[in-house]
From Swiss-Prot:
Task of the protein: Component of the mitochondrial ribosome (mitoribosome), a dedicated translation machinery responsible for the synthesis of mitochondrial genome-encoded proteins, including at least some of the essential transmembrane subunits of the mitochondrial respiratory chain. The mitoribosomes are attached to the mitochondrial inner membrane and translation products are cotranslationally integrated into the membrane.
Protein location: Mitochondrion
Regions of compositional bias (Low complexity) in chain numbering: 453-464
Name recorded for this polypeptide: Small ribosomal subunit protein bS1m
BP terms from Gene Ontology: mitochondrial translational initiation
Subunit structure: Component of the mitochondrial small ribosomal subunit (mt-SSU). Mature N.crassa 74S mitochondrial ribosomes consist of a small (37S) and a large (54S) subunit. The 37S small subunit contains a 16S ribosomal RNA (16S mt-rRNA) and 32 different proteins. The 54S large subunit contains a 23S rRNA (23S mt-rRNA) and 42 different proteins.
Superkingdom, natural source: Eukaryota
Keyword set, alphabetical order: Mitochondrion
A GO term from the CC aspect: mitochondrial small ribosomal subunit
GO molecular function terms noted in the UniProt entry: structural constituent of ribosome
Length: 470
């Protein structure tokens, strides 16, 4: 006979408390069929899906990780960094299913060592341009807000990052048809009521504008105000006629549908793409940073950094304040090849980034570090770079923008880690002693030096001719 064991009130409280429970698992990133590496089981995921746990060294030696049961020492004490991810607290075998969490745990530590903030993405893809947009933090007070009133939700659409509706440009044809059938079509009646409110507001605004113009012609100081029209006063024929007029105004129609369904901003297509999408030709450009790639699936910072700015100075103990931040070493993962789309790929703090662009040192012709792969280099080829910007794209992946580091900054960084082979400003010049050439003393010179002063070879006193008297 099966029976259920009773749980104490304290145990039930701990089980239901969010403070003493692991957060739910985040869905994994969608796989791309064109990139088979994302389908491999050994590949590192784009972002962590499980909570990473750590413990003290004294507790790890006992297998105590703060869980329901201790973890085996053989698989947890052999690693340098104590980090695990719990997949399942109680499996079918009544054990705790866990795996190593150093993949994302060390990546987080490496990224936080860079001390750079997360910025909103920009549409400028060429960092070598002279004009660079000002980096805007994702934690600004006017953008890092999710609770909006209905009016603010419409006014702040260009600054928001969270929407209840989808991003239409990122949907497949099948997903779009399913969205129309299950979400849009059942809301026809609600949309007509929404249009009634818009018509009532427009009629009220037009009436007030007419009253103000009439008062201005009469010379009245104060104009009368029209009582707001009620949405119930708008007939179905007016709604139908208004919808017919909207068919010829793509921008107004898209704005109203986007406000009603709370759709993410959509960037208009380019001139070449506009021919295939004739309905999107007249759409105006959006100022939203997520119009081109879509809003992020998480918070724009992804929880990887909470810094708001990089406006600080590094103070060197010997050389004083530095103009730029310390550079970091990057590993060349893929050398540069000739042709479009074959740029070099480098690894920075656990992330893959594009190589420095423009006329930089690493792009000079004949630079063997970026041009070819040399397997004889221990640990792989490396170069020093500066991390200029970090963003999180719509799929939750961290994108880094790097540039070549200055030679002086590289020497200072090498000196701090004891790898500088030569002084930064060169060795101090040695003090040059004033030397005199020694001339050998001959017998004649000795006789002339010690010659008797009573019989000089030349007169010791000048005559009157020496003073110009003769």
């Amino acid at each position: 006979m099966a029976f259920s064991r009773g749980v104490s009130p304290g145990g039930a409280l701990l089980r239901t408390s969010r403070m003493f429970s692991l957060p739910p698992v985040i869905p994994p990133p969608p796989g791309n069929k064109l990139q088979m590496i994302s389908e491999r089981a050994s590949a590192t995921e784009a972002y962590p899906t499980h909570q990473v746990l750590t413990t003290f060294e004294s507790s790890r030696s006992r297998g105590d990780w703060g869980l329901k049961r201790p973890l085996p020492l053989k698989s947890t004490t052999g690693t340098t960094y104590p980090m695990v991810k719990v997949k399942e607290m109680d499996s079918l075998e009544q054990i705790t299913d866990f795996t190593s969490g150093t993949q994302h745990g060390l990546t987080l530590k490496k990224f936080q060592a860079l001390n750079i903030p997360i910025s909103t993405p920009s549409e400028i893809s060429d960092p070598s341009r002279l004009f660079r947009p000002v980096q805007r933090s994702v934690f600004e007070a006017d953008t890092d807000v999710t609770a909006f009133s209905p009016d603010e939700q419409i006014q702040e659409a260009e600054k928001r990052w969270k929407f209840s509706g989808p991003w239409l440009a990122g949907m497949t044809p099948g997903e779009f048809k399913e969205y129309l059938a299950k979400t849009v079509r059942p809301k026809r009646a609600e949309f007509r009521k929404f249009i009634q409110k818009k018509i009532a507001a427009q009629k009220t605004e037009a009436a007030n504008r007419e009253l103000q113009e009439t008062a201005a012609l009469r010379g009245d100081a104060v104009a009368e105000t029209q009582e707001p029209f009620k949405p119930e006063s708008i007939t179905d024929d007016e709604v139908t006629e208004y919808l017919r007029r909207l068919r010829n105004d793509n921008q107004v129609l898209y704005d109203l549908v986007g406000q009603f369904l709370d759709l993410a901003p959509l960037k208009p297509p380019q001139a070449a793409e506009a021919r295939q999408h004739s309905l999107l030709v007249n759409l105006r450009a959006t100022d939203s940073p997520y119009g081109g790639r879509g809003p992020p699936i998480t918070h724009p910072s992804a929880g990887i950094s909470y810094l708001r700015t990089a406006a600080y100075l590094n103070n060197h103990p010997i050389y004083g304040p530095q103009k730029s931040h310390p550079p970091v070493q990057a590993r060349v993962l893929k050398p540069r090849r000739g042709g479009l789309g074959n740029d070099a790929k480098i690894g920075v703090a656990g992330f893959v980034a594009d190589g420095p662009l423009g006329t930089s040192h690493s792009n000079l012709r004949g630079n063997s570090v970026m041009d070819k792969f040399d397997p004889s280099i221990e640990g792989g080829a490396k170069l020093w770079v500066n991390v200029d910007k970090a963003t999180v794209d719509s799929t939750g992946r961290v994108q880094l923008t790097v540039s070549d580091a200055k030679a002086t900054d590289v020497l200072i960084a090498k000196e701090l880690i004891g790898d500088a082979r030569e002084p930064i400003f060169g060795s101090a010049p040695k003090r040059q002693e004033k030397t005199f050439k020694k001339i050998p003393m001959t017998a004649a010179r000795l006789r002339g030096r010690y010659e008797n002063s009573d019989s000089p070879s030349s007169p010791t006193m000048s005559g009157s001719s020496g003073y110009g008297l003769r």
